[in-house]
Structure formats: C-alpha cells, structure tokens
C-alpha cells in the first residue's frame, strides 16, 4: 500500500512538473511577455520551436490580421524578438514559421502554403496577412509566391497580402542556383503587395563578399527600398534590418 501511494505521488508530481514546464514554455512565447533585455535567450527558445506555424501569443479567434515571420538560415532567433513584439497589436495574431533551412529553399514550399490555408480556416475574420522573411527565409518565401497567390485566389476571399523580403537572398550565387535548381524567371506582377528591403551590401555581414548584390529581384512590381547605414546608433547590418523594417511598417499603419 505504501509502495502504491509512493508511486502514485511520484506520478502526480511528474504530471505537475510537465504541466508547469509546458505553461512556462507557452509564457516564454507570449509576445506580450517578450523581454527586450533577454533577446538572445528568447531567440534560442524561438528557433527551438517545432517546424511549422507557431502562435506566439494567446489565441484570438476574432483577429483580423495575421503576421508571420520566416527565419533565415542558421538563425539564432534574437533578431526576431523586437520586430515581432513591435508588430503585435490587439487586433492581430503573430506567428513564427519554422522550416528546415538545411534543405534547398524551393523544397517543401507547399507546407508553408498549406499552413497559411489552415490559418485562414481558423481565423474567419482575417482581412490582411503580413509575411516577413529574412535572409535565406526570403528565398523560401520567394519560391512560395506562386503557390500562395494561387491558393488565395482559390479561396475567393477579399484578402490583402503583404510580402516583405528583408535582407533576403533573392538572387543566389550560381553554384547554389545549380545545386538547388533555382529558377530565375518570375512574373513581373503579382496580386500581392511585395516589398524588398535591402541593406547596404558593403556593411551587411552576410552579403558583403558577394560579387553582386544578392538582394536584387526581377519582379518589376516590387517596391524597392535601400536601408540606411545606421539604426539607433548601430551599424544597420544583416540582423538589425528586421527591426528597422518593423519600425517602418508600424509607423506606416
């Protein structure tokens, strides 16, 4: 009897610990609880989330806008903490899309589109979607554009879609293009609003050694913006670019 009681107590204690652990994890990813002074630790938690679409706040079924962040290759996550917090408001839902950045960026793009489709099923009041991509995540989004446009058209909904490429690898070097069989011909015009935010190549740690600026894109309808040299007293390089763009988006809304 004592052995049974002891085992039961241990089982209950284990369940309690698991519940507390999961609760703490949920709280860690509540966008309203983000602590800007702890961005590196929070960033590690962010990129440890499972592949797929991860909600970063308490669910609001009546949200009329979705904000989705798509990380770059080997992301440490910290570069997304402030931008996602900045873009959050009481009327939207903020998500972080984890994808396998060790694969070619034109692989498994249907998964991103399917998950966006599921979000629209779950949030029936949504009128606008903002998708922000960074670095190699921009490559993944670029090769998803046609699928996203087709899927949105099939839904026959009145939706405004904003695509934001931020310091993104949109014109990959030849070896990567050949290895992944990246296409280089894109439509001149899309039904979505496309914004290309480009850092100054010479001060971008990820792109400064490229012979040509890999942030250029052949979509003529895309809005092109070159970022300044500094941001809040810092050099505006590769990772700070998301924060600068988030401020611009917030100010324009």
Residue spans for each PLM region:
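Short, aromatic/basic amphipathic alpha-helical patches
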Residues: 81-89, 148-151, 178-185, 207-219
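Cleavable N-terminal signal peptides
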Residues: 15-16, 26
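Active-site catalytic motif of lipid deacylating hydrolases and related acyltransferases
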Residues: 28-127
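C-terminal catalytic-base region of ester-bond hydrolases, centering on the histidine
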Residues: 183-253
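Serine-dependent carboxylesterase/thioesterase catalytic core
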Residues: 99-102, 106-204
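Bacterial N-terminal signal peptides that target proteins for export
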Residues: 3-13
């Amino acid at each position: 009897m004592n052995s049974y009681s002891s085992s039961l107590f241990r089982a209950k204690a284990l369940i309690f610990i698991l519940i507390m652990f999961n609760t703490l994890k949920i709280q860690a990813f509540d966008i309203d609880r983000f602590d800007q002074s702890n961005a590196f630790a929070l960033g590690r938690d962010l990129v440890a989330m499972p592949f797929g679409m991860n909600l970063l706040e308490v669910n609001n079924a009546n949200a009329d806008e979705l904000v989705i962040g798509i990380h770059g290759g080997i992301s440490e996550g910290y570069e997304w903490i402030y931008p996602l917090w900045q873009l959050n408001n009481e009327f939207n839902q903020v998500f972080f899309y984890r994808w396998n950045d060790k694969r070619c960026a034109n692989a498994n793009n249907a998964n991103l589109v399917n998950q966006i489709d599921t979000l629209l099923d779950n949030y029936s009041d949504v009128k606008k979607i903002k998708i922000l991509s960074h670095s190699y995540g921009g490559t993944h989004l670029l090769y998803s554009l046609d699928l996203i446009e087709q899927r949105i058209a099939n839904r026959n909904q009145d939706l405004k879609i904003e695509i934001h490429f931020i310091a993104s690898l949109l014109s990959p070097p030849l070896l990567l293009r050949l290895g992944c069989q990246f296409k280089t011909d894109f439509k001149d015009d899309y039904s979505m609003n496309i914004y290309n935010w480009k850092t100054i190549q010479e001060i971008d740690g990820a792109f400064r050694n490229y012979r040509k600026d890999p942030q250029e894109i052949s979509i003529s309808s895309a809005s092109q913006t070159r970022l300044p040299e500094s941001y809040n007293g810092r050099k505006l390089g590769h990772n700070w670019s998301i924060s600068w763009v988030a401020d611009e988006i917030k100010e324009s809304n």
